[in-house]
């Protein structure tokens, strides 16, 4: 079992791996907070909390970033939110299982900004590739690994 201080935050609007988060969180007895701009349906479970952060442009992102702390995990595809959470000392994982780290977040943010600019000029059309079963599997593995890594760090003598 992992220290109850670890909380999993989910940037829940359009997150394709909510069910996977529930399963892993239940296995490790970790609380989950799903944050969305509006109402979302979540299972009735004592470890699962739903937050409707409001309809502002970045309301859900701001809500998460203001509360996340070292040892917490955020699941998000939003690169600026991931950057804010990593800077706060949290672990950030994309729904496809890709971890956002201190070493990678700067380049990831720069590529995201470049792609946004290229799309706005019409140089690139379309979006990301479709979410696959392999992405789901990679995510499950990444989330489980992150939880175990945090638990080891907390258990290590200081």
Swiss-Prot record:
Pfam families xref list: DUF188
CDD domains the record matches: PIN_YqxD-like
Family in the record: Belongs to the UPF0178 family.
Protein name: UPF0178 protein RPA2191
């Amino acid at each position: 079992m992992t220290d109850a201080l670890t909380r999993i935050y989910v940037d829940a609007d359009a997150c394709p791996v909510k069910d996977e988060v529930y399963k892993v969180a239940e296995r490790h007895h970790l609380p989950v907070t799903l944050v969305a701009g509006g109402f979302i349906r979540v299972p009735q479970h004592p470890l699962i909390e739903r937050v409707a952060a409001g309809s502002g442009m970045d309301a859900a992102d701001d809500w998460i970033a203001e509360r996340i702390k070292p040892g917490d995990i955020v699941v998000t595809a939003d690169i600026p939110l991931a950057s804010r959470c990593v800077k706060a000392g949290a672990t950030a994982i994309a729904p496809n299982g890709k971890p956002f780290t201190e070493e990678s977040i700067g380049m990831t943010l720069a590529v995201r900004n470049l792609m946004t600019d290229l799309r706005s000029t019409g140089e690139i059309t379309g979006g990301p590739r479709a979410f696959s079963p392999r992405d789901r599997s990679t995510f499950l593995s990444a989330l489980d690994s992150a939880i175990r890594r945090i638990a080891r760090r907390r258990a290590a003598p200081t």
